Structures are given as C-alpha cells and as structure tokens.
Regions:
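FMN-binding flavodoxin-like domain, especially the glycine-rich phosphate-binding loop
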Residues: 2-36, 42-173, 230-236, 240-253
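Charged, low-complexity surface patches
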Residues: 91-92, 181, 209
C-alpha cells in the first residue's frame, strides 16, 4: 500500500494540514502537486490497495475549478480516498461534497473527510498561525481514527455535509499586481498554477485567467506583488463579521 498526498496549496496552508494528516498515515508519501501546471495528470495512477489524501482549499465554498479539471485526469482505480478541505475560518460550505463527487468520478472510494482551518489566503490576519498546536493534535487524533478504519478494511462512505446542487461559484476575482519593487525574476510566473502571469513580463497578468489564489504573492522574494488596498480592505471588513470566532477541525467518518 502506498499513501498518495494529492494537494492543491497555492499559499502553503492546505499543504500544512495535508502533511499533518497524510504524514500520520505513512511517513513516506507520494506527493502529487496539483498547482504544477506542467504535470501531466493523466499519468497519475493508483491501485485499489493505495490510499490518497486529497487536500484542497475552499474558494468561496467550492473546489477551485482548476482542481476539478486536474483531478478529472487522475486514475483512482478504486484507491481509498481521505478528503481534506481547508478554509480560512469562514466556512467550507459545499467544498467537501463537491470534492467527494469529483473523487468518485476519478475512481476513488471515499472513506473519510476532514475540514480544517489555515490562515486565510487573502486576508492573512484571519486564522493567523493556523494550523496551530491545537489543530495538529486534533488532526493527529483524526488520522488515528482514519488509520483504524483503513486497517479494518472498512470502505463505508461517510456522511459529508453540503448541498447538491452546489452553491454558485464566486465570480469576484482579485488579481495581484506587481509593484515598483518587481525585479522581473519570474518566480511568480513560474509558480502560477494557471499560467496567468507572462513569463517575459511578470507585470502583465491575465485577469480573466487569474483565480485569486495568491500564490504569486506567497512566492515573491521581494514582496513585490500586492492586491489593490481598497479591495483588500473591503474583503477584510466583510470577513471580520464572520471570521472572528474560532472554528475547529471536523472529521466525517
């Protein structure tokens, strides 16, 4: 049995959670990076004896569309799947049920699901420092329960919260822009999951292609990519009404 860690983590928060879950199941995992636009996902294939921890962020309560497209290329071949949804302390809404449907279409058997919290990718002040020690302890406990289910060869499906049809996907995108501090190193263009930044001129961003994942901000070595401060302020004000109270990780098994 191999444990695959299939993860989409533009700013690193989802990866932290994913590692806590997958690493507790097996210290030697096979990583599939869904942010890698150069990877041929048709070549990703598992067997029925394998386990896949599929970890994605919630974008306005949905699975990012690019994740759906790339998971549709993967061959689950009956492998058992543990679904992980990570959100910035607002809500994950229909993300897990959508991920369940996508995983099943790709040939996985869903045996467990986890929702967890990480620092908000846009307004970083919300859920700052998470996953923290309390989250890590809780996720380790979840992983132990999942491991017991796997060892018992219990393939029963969990009851996962969410709605079908899913909520409408968010349409308001915010594309970060390069500031005067940009030195044209190209790190942002190389890392963009959807190739929305021109490699020859990283100050040019295709707004219609950008998915507002904030990866370019996260990888810029000079902090030279920023969101429009007025738009960021508006988002922060909106989130302040729903992100103040700490939300906890949940296990669905």
């Amino acid at each position: 049995m191999s444990v695959f860690e299939i993860v989409f983590s533009p700013t690193g928060g989802t990866e932290k959670v994913s590692c806590l879950v997958a690493g507790a199941l097996d210290k030697n995992t096979v990583t599939v990076d869904l942010t890698d636009s150069g990877l041929d996902f048709h070549e990703v294939s598992m067997t029925k004896d394998d386990v896949a921890v599929i970890s994605v962020p919630a974008y306005a309560g949905r699975v990012p569309a690019v994740v759906v497209d790339r998971l549709n290329m993967v061959h689950g071949n009956g492998a058992r799947a543990v679904l992980v949804c990570v959100y910035g302390n607002r809500a994950f809404e229909d993300t897990l049920v959508e991920l369940e449907d996508v995983a099943k279409r790709a040939g996985f058997r869903v045996v467990a699901a986890v929702s967890a919290i990480a620092e908000h990718s846009v307004a970083r002040q919300f859920a700052a420092g998470r996953p923290d020690a309390q989250d890590a302890a809780q996720l380790a406990e979840f992983a132990q329960q999942i491991q017991q289910k796997l060892l018992a060869e219990d393939a029963s499906e969990p009851s996962i919260p969410g709605n079908r049809p899913y909520k409408q996907a968010g349409s308001h995108r915010m594309a970060p822009e390069a500031t005067e501090d940009c030195v044209f190193c190209g790190a942002c263009a190389a890392a963009c999951p959807v190739c929305a930044i021109e490699k020859g001129d990283p100050k040019r961003t295709a707004g219609e292609a950008c998915i507002s994942c904030m990866r370019c901000i996260a990888v810029c070595p000079r902090g030279a990519r920023k969101l429009d401060p007025n738009k960021l302020s508006a988002v922060s004000q909106m989130l302040s009404k729903v992100c103040v109270v700490r939300k906890e990780c949940e296990l669905f098994i």
